[in-house]
Structure formats: structure tokens, C-alpha cells
Amino acid sequence: MIISASTDYRAAAQRKLPPFLFHYIDGGAYNEQTLRRNTADLADIALRQRVLKNMSELSLETQLFGETQAMPVVLGPVGLSGMYARRGEVQAARAADKKGIPFTLSTLSVCPIEEVAPAIARPMWFQLYVLKDRGFMRNALTRAQAAGVKTLVFTVDMPVPGARYRDAHSGMSGPNAAARRLLQAIAHPQWAWDVGLNGKPHDLGNISAYLGKPTTLEDYMGWIATNFDPSISWKDLEWVREFWQGPMIIKGILDPEDAKDAVKFGADGIVVSNHGGRQLDGVLSTARALPAIADAVKGDITILADSGIRTGLDVVRMIALGADSVLLGRAFVYALATAGEAGVINLLTLIEQEMRVAMTLTGAKRIADINRDSLAVSERG
């Protein structure tokens, strides 16, 4: 299959992956209305074309939490990335490092902190949930600091797991799930050889290191079901703020009042996010939620955004709507599944090229030049 656009990777990944893995990354909660709106609403945002602006000098470089990055894009945390390519978190981290942007390791990664951090020169970011097992949280934070992590992404929109019907249909969960996954793997020999046989161990590296024993996919599903804490509040984050000396980002903000609370709390950044449509179906798309949040806290806190971003045009749209940078999730996992590290590098190169075209034709020479004026008049609200 010829890859000529950043969006081509989804179809390529679907061909290569066993269905349980493809639908796990591709699916959303309930009827997936928010999942669809994330991409549709963002694609509907019209940019304002400008001409004759002498765009011979153009830069995508930006600053984020005191670090220079090549473009305002971060590889966000995606659980089980190591099931999509052999030692997938390491491959994705290397791709991000080579492209000059941060990589965020998920709590629920296959590769542990100690395997990923030494593989790259740039300090990676680490994502953590508020969990019932506070001992695990302290252990993970201590290990992340020891590995040189400076930026913590705290995900707060999972007090309970979302209802993801596709997982039961595909074999990720539900009756006879293990047998169904085995049959699917046999039917996808390339993945079975590269990842299934040669990508082991297939456990949750960060959790196994804490528990002192390997964890299976069934353990993963059970751990999710029992360890997320519906009682969480801002008070649960206070001890983390005292413990963690580096930048702390609150991920899962979708309302201006919560964004204001994050500022009061002393967070360094927020991620405007509906978890890629994987938690509460029927909520606003990130593209629709972002402008009001930016109006409420822009300048008081660094604003990142995710959910629905597939192209360089989408990155420009999100920044015009009020984000300082964006996180990629599904988009980079599709590329990772298709061609590993090289696929992610190519995806980021395509996104960079798409951003350059969009900035050239909207008259934005620097990332700081992208704002509401970059949108068509009808989009400015």
C-alpha cells in the first residue's frame, strides 16, 4: 500500500493488525458519536487563506515547558503501544526523538520506564492515573524521576473505565476472548511473528515491575476494572504536586470551570481532551470545547489539546482555536503498527509538511502567528 498522506496509515494498520488490536485503538465509547465528532468537527473548521505575504522564511519551532521542540506536536500516552509493533513504545520514542518532539509513556505501556528512557536523548514525558493503589503511584513517580523524566501528564478523566462495546465484539474482552485473539493472531502471520513471538514480554512493564511478577492481557483488563478510583478529587493531586518538582499537566479537561480549577491548583498545563471519545460518549468534541477554555485561561496556563487530530491541517486548526501544542494518539499508533519507527517518522514528516503548506497559505510565519485570525470569519464566534 502506498502511503502518501498522514491519513493513509489507518487503512494500512487495519490490514496488518489482528482485529482485537485494531479495534481497541480505533474504537470509542458506547455508540462512538464523540469519536466521530472529534474528527468531523475539526475537519469542518475553515481556515483563512492569505496571499502575497512573503513566506520564504517559516519556522514550526516552539517552546514548551522550557524546552525547544521542532513543531508543536507531542506523541501522547497510548496504553499497550508495545502490542502494535515489536517493543513499540521504544520505537515510537525513538521516532519522536529523531523528529525533535517529546514522547509520552503511558502508565499502561508494554515497555517499562527503564527500557524506554535510556533509548532516547530527549527526556520523555510520563503519564499517570489517579489510582486506588497509591503505592503504585509513588513507585511509578520515583522510577520516572530516577529515569530523568521531568514532565508529568496526569490523566483525570478515567475515574471509571468507559464502556467500549467494540472491545467485546473484537475479542479484546468478552466471552472466549483469549481463544478469539489466538485465532486472529494466526490469521495475521506477519504480526504474529514480529510482535506476537519476537516482541515479548507482552506484559504491562510498569505494573509488573511494581508487582514483581508478569502481567497478562487478562490482568490488564482486570487491573483497569478494579484500580481506577471514582472518589478522586483535586485533593488527591495535592500530594503529587508536592512530590513532583517538574512540570505537571492535567489531561482530560473539557470544561472552562475545570480549566480554571487547574490554574488555581497550580498545574503547569492542561490537555483539553475527551480521551479520544473513549470515555463519555455524547460530550463535546475537543474542537468545539477548546475555544471557550482558551478564552477562560489562555495566558495563565499552557494549553494542549488532543482527540481527532490526524493531519498537519488539524494541528494548525487546534492552535488557531487556542492550543499551544497538540498530542497525537491514534494517528501515531496506526503508523507504528504499519511500519514501526520508520512509519512514525514518516507520519511526523507528513504532518510537518502539511503544517508548512497551511501556514504558508494562511500567512503565519511562526507558530505564535497562528490564532483566531487564522480562521475564516465565520469560524471566529
Swiss-Prot record:
EC number(s) reported in the record: 1.1.-.-
Necessary cofactors: FMN
Record: residues binding substrate: Y24, Y129, R164, R278
All copies of domain FMN hydroxy acid dehydrogenase, residue ranges: 1-380
GO cellular component: plasma membrane
Binding site for FMN: 106, 127, 155, 251, 306-330
Catalyzed reaction equations: (S)-lactate + A = pyruvate + AH2
Record carries keyword Lipid biosynthesis: no
UniProt membrane topology term: Peripheral membrane protein
Keywords: Cell inner membrane, Cell membrane, Flavoprotein, FMN, Membrane, Oxidoreductase
Gene3D superfamilies per record: Aldolase class I
Cell compartment(s), UniProt: Cell inner membrane
UniProt entry tagged with the keyword Membrane: yes
Active-site residues (renumbered): H275
Family annotation (InterPro entries): Aldolase_TIM, Alpha-hydoxy_acid_DH_FMN, FMN-dep_DH, FMN_HAD, FMN_hydac_DH_AS, LldD
Pfam families given in the database record: FMN_dh (PF01070)
GO MF entries: FMN binding; L-lactate dehydrogenase activity
Biological process, per Gene Ontology: aerobic respiration; lactate metabolic process
Function of the protein: Catalyzes the conversion of L-lactate to pyruvate. Is coupled to the respiratory chain.
Family membership: Belongs to the FMN-dependent alpha-hydroxy acid dehydrogenase family.
PANTHER family: L-LACTATE DEHYDROGENASE (PTHR10578:SF85), S -2-HYDROXY-ACID OXIDASE-RELATED (PTHR10578)
Name recorded for this polypeptide: L-lactate dehydrogenase
Native organism: Yersinia pestis
